[in-house]
């Protein structure tokens, strides 16, 4: 196939899509160029599904190569290793709007690989990767119901910005990524500076309107490439099997969904499934039906039963009204030796959240393609198997845990103090101890309480809520504080975090078309009411940060010295700084601009270290009296150390009012003496006098 190119203007950027020259053995491949950021995005679809495959095996891998930024990776091996947190998050970002656009029965392996091969530090790879994935799938001839477009939206001075650069995002009040088809929004991911629901919804509609340029360009590209439509056909439904299944179940599934407790409801449904399968075992064998298909159709009936029930009765499977939030219980200071902690429980979802405060050196150094930087606010989310009553392997964080942790971090980021105002590295860890829906939002609530318990000066408390939507035709219901079952069986789920003032994070995933702006507006208003209710419940724990840090948290003292004095504080081979830290038991960080941060659990020790540093960096004042130690005896006098690294000469004539024949007769090395500074000459040499101190004392006595 000849090389085909499509170019269009997208905000301030020129975007070019190329296909037909590179990676021609992939099912679909496209080079995406956005200014100097260049990605190769490929899609490969298997010709058939694997035997026994019962789910859609879509894999998305986004990777940033260090050569893209003209850098060699750090570390021993000097090559890219496992996926970074950023790569994992962008992989999930691509997956979320693409997955719902494949038919339910499509079970062929599909792999998308997006590789950043050239990186303009001002143009991130996320939007080009989403565009490339959409184009590659459209070219691959899969039963993909796309293409999709994607846009990043900023907000500044009351105006939306399309695809802002990294520099523009630095002072933007919003960073929102939206993806969708020509008719529908499918995915929203955002971080905001406490904006209103109206501004957030406006950003979504603005981004969806602008992304039509992307969709049109991809459609033109596939036409020019002569892409053949997919020949895949969904397997025919087995009406006899479905009819037999419905008859065997009867009204029991509807009754099971009236059981309000999650585990009891799960057990009731499992018992029905087991009984039905045993009842139909003979017929399944006689008719040659596939047991896997029977299981799948049982799941489909579960889905329909729950949806019909909530649409008809407006009562949910746990008995709540549509907008009711589950009972909330909060505790703070639950772990005595941590620097801050909380226990947040909402229904059957629970999180223990801890805060650890460290110094700037405890920050995480990120070796990124665009350059190395340090992260001083860390948020880690853990989801152990016991939280859902299951056994499982304990290993490193999975993609889901990384994604949920990032969402929770976005939720509280808008209220965090600057590093200048609160010079600590802050690590938040959310341990999910129970889960039945929206553990990420429980992490937001728990982290807000734990931060206040730790005395971190957050601007305001933050709460998060997960919302759901069930829609059939014109009928729809919006659900507040969804359960795990409602998340899986609904048409839209979205999570909103924020303060009483506004939204700090919004994540939205939509599985169907037909979600109008009015529906989203209603859902956001219902979410606001739920968020305010949760904030009210959280106020029973804490309403503002504690005035004092934990007894076990390090106290930080910050002082500023002239950068030229840094070498004096460090000393030869680090001897001075090492001596101070060893003698005072403190940890000392020195920055290039002369900022020194002293950390110690003991406030007295921190003050002692501060005094030592101030001594070292202070200038010697003529006329001032110092207490010093005799460092060296010479024939013509003695050198006395009056400040660390600062020695002055007491000439033999300045030792005493009486005549001194031999310096060693009066002074010995190590003697502590009082001296007065007579002069500091242009070369920095210090003249001292013991005699002047004697004479001053004598004059005072008279």
Swiss-Prot record:
InterPro entries: ExoRNase_PH_dom1 (IPR001247), ExoRNase_PH_dom2 (IPR015847), ExoRNase_PH_dom2_sf (IPR036345), KH_dom (IPR004087), KH_dom_type_1 (IPR004088), KH_dom_type_1_sf (IPR036612), NA-bd_OB-fold (IPR012340), PNPase (IPR012162). SUPFAM superfamilies: Eukaryotic type KH-domain (KH-domain type I), Nucleic acid-binding proteins, Polynucleotide phosphorylase/guanosine pentaphosphate synthase (PNPase/GPSI), domain 3, Ribonuclease PH domain 2-like, Ribosomal protein S5 domain 2-like. GO terms for cellular component: cytosol. It is an enzyme of class 2 (transferase). Its main location: cytoplasm. GO terms for biological process: mRNA catabolic process; RNA processing. It comes from Stenotrophomonas maltophilia (strain K279a). PANTHER family: POLYRIBONUCLEOTIDE NUCLEOTIDYLTRANSFERASE (PTHR11252), POLYRIBONUCLEOTIDE NUCLEOTIDYLTRANSFERASE 1, MITOCHONDRIAL (PTHR11252:SF0). Mg(2+) binds at residues 487, 493. Keywords: Cytoplasm, Magnesium, Metal-binding, Nucleotidyltransferase, RNA-binding, Transferase. This is Polyribonucleotide nucleotidyltransferase. Its cofactor is Mg(2+). It is found in: Cytoplasm. The keyword Cytoplasm applies. Belongs to the polyribonucleotide nucleotidyltransferase family. Component of the RNA degradosome, which is a multiprotein complex involved in RNA processing and mRNA degradation.
């Amino acid at each position: 196939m000849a090389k085909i190119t499509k170019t269009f203007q997208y905000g301030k950027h020129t975007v070019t899509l190329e296909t037909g020259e590179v990676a021609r053995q992939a099912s679909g491949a496209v080079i995406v160029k956005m200014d100097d950021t260049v990605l190769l995005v490929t899609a490969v679809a298997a010709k058939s599904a694997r035997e026994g495959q019962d789910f859609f095996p879509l894999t998305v891998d986004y990777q940033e190569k260090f050569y893209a930024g003209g850098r060699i990776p750090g570390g021993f091996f000097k090559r890219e290793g496992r996926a970074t947190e950023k790569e994992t998050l962008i992989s999930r970002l691509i997956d979320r709007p693409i997955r719902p656009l494949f038919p339910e029965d499509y079970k062929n392996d599909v792999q998308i690989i997006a590789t950043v091969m050239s990186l303009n530090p001002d143009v991130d790879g996320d939007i080009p990767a989403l565009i490339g994935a959409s184009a590659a799938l459209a070219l691959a001839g899969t039963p993909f119901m796309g293409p999709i477009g994607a846009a990043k939206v900023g907000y500044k001075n009351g105006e939306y910005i399309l695809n802002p650069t990294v520099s523009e995002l630095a002072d933007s009040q919003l960073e929102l990524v939206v993806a969708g088809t020509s008719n529908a929004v499918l995915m929203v991911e955002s971080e905001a500076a406490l904006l209103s629901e109206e501004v957030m919804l406006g950003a979504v509609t603005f981004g969806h309107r602008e992304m039509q340029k992307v969709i049109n360009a991809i459609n033109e590209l596939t036409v020019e490439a002569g892409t053949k439509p997919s020949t895949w056909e969904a397997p025919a439904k087995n009406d006899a099997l479905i009819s037999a299944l419905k008859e065997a179940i009867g009204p029991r599934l509807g009754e099971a969904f009236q059981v309000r407790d999650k585990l009891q409801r799960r057990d009731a449904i499992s018992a029905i499934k087991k009984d039905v399968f045993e009842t139909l075992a003979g017929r399944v064998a006689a008719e040659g039906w596939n047991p896997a298909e029977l299981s799948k159709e049982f799941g489909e009936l579960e889905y329909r039963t729950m949806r019909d029930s909530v649409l008809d009765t407006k009562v949910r499977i746990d008995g709540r009204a549509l907008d009711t939030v589950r009972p909330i219980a909060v505790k703070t200071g639950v772990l005595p030796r941590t620097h801050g902690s909380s226990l947040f429980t909402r229904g059957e979802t629970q999180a223990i959240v801890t805060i650890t405060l460290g110094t700037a050196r405890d920050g995480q150094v990120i070796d990124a393609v665009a350059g190395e930087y340090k992260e001083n606010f860390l948020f880690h989310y853990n989801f152990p198997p016991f939280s859902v009553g299951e056994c499982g392997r304990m290993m490193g964080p999975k993609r889901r845990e990384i994604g949920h942790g990032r969402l929770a971090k976005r939720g509280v980021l808008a209220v965090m103090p600057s590093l200048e105002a609160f010079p600590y590295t802050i690590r938040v860890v959310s341990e999910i101890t129970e889960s039945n829906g929206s553990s990420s939002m429980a992490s937001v609530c728990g982290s807000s309480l734990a931060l206040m318990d730790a005395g971190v000066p957050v601007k305001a408390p933050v709460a998060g809520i997960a919302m759901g939507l069930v829609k059939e035709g014109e009928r729809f219901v919006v659900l507040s504080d969804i359960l795990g079952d409602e998340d899986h069986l609904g048409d839209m789920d979205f999570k909103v975090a924020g303060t009483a003032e506004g939204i700090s994070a919004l994540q939205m995933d939509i599985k169907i078309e037909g979600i109008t702006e009015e529906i989203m507006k209603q859902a956001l208003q219902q979410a606001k009411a739920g968020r305010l209710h949760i904030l009210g419940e959280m106020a029973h724990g804490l309403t503002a940060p504690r005035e004092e840090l934990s007894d076990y948290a390090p106290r930080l003292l910050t002082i500023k010295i002239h950068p030229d004095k840094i070498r004096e504080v460090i000393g030869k081979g680090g001897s001075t700084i090492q001596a101070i830290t060893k003698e005072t038991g403190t940890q000392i960080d020195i920055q290039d601009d002369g900022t020194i941060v002293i950390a110690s659990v003991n406030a007295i020790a921190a003050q002692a270290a501060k005094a030592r540093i101030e001594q070292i960096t202070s200038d010697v004042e003529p006329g001032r009296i110092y207490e010093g130690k005799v460092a060296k005896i010479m024939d013509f006098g003695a050198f006395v150390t009056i400040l660390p690294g600062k020695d002055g000469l007491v000439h033999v004539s300045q030792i005493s009012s009486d005549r001194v024949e031999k310096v060693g007769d009066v002074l010995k090395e190590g003697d502590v003496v009082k001296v007065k500074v007579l002069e500091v000459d242009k070369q920095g040499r210090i003249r001292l006098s013991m005699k002047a101190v004697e004479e001053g004392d004598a004059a005072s006595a008279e």
